[in-house]
């Protein structure tokens, strides 16, 4: 049976389009797992937030929300809002485009991310939120018999 380690992260967001770098926390979960090689999955429960990778720098932190706005603009009618009257139909659409999870392989206990690639959480709801992020690490521990 493959070992599984789960860690939960608690986040608070201030506004729509908050982007938070989770790379350090995910790497820490890999280290805490004691596993040598495998995959780390990062997942956000809910339908108005997303997990992805990006070069986490100020320019892209502004560009990414603007790109999402083109796919799901504020100024159109969303059927979701007619049903729920919560004004966040666009939040659900954006979140479904980006997705709620990401899996990253690791080797020798280190995430195999590119030099300019960070794991980020993206808040897409229209109000501040408390979020729980689930990091699940699966893999193999290094053994002396491995060659």
Predicted regions and their residues:
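Active-site histidine-anchored catalytic micro-motif
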Residues: 1-147
């Amino acid at each position: 049976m493959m070992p599984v380690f789960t860690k939960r992260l608690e986040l608070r967001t201030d506004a729509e389009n908050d982007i938070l770098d989770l790379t350090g926390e995910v790497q820490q979960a890999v280290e805490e797992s004691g596993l040598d090689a495998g995959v780390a999955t990062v997942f956000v429960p809910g339908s108005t937030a997303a997990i992805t990778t990006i070069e986490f720098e100020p320019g892209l932190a502004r560009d990414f929300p603007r790109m999402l706005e083109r796919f799901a603009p504020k100024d159109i009618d969303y059927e979701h809002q007619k049903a729920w009257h919560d004004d966040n139909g666009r939040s659900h659409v954006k979140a479904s485009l980006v997705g709620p999870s990401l899996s990253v392989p690791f080797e020798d206990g280190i995430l195999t991310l590119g030099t300019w690639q960070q794991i980020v959480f993206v808040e897409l709801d229209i109000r501040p939120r408390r979020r729980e992020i689930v990091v699940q690490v699966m893999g193999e521990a290094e053994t002396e018999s491995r060659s």
